[in-house]
């Protein structure tokens, strides 16, 4: 759900300048809408009712007046079981899974990252064994082994 919206007023390489309505914050994630694709970007500077955003995909075909949707969430990485078995890109997309999904679109797609394609960083369809060593109410500190 978009918390704020905006329109692109300038494109320069992988940077876009956006005039927005609503509240936004530095490091907030937004998406530049390009047809049926949404290109992930992060706010790197806010100046009044405009912000500069770094787009994490090719900005080819983005134009002035294209729509931008802001998420109200900061750029973050998800932590949990299964991370050590994956190879990720800078947005925590698991590259092997991304290639598999992309190859469904085009045979050539498995060699190149597809614009606007993002996957969950951790597998949601797996169960992980966890044997807790700490109990509810135990006082824990940094470095404690919980299980």
Residue map of PLM features:
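Peripheral, non-AAA+ core regions of ATP-driven protein-machinery
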Residues: 1-147
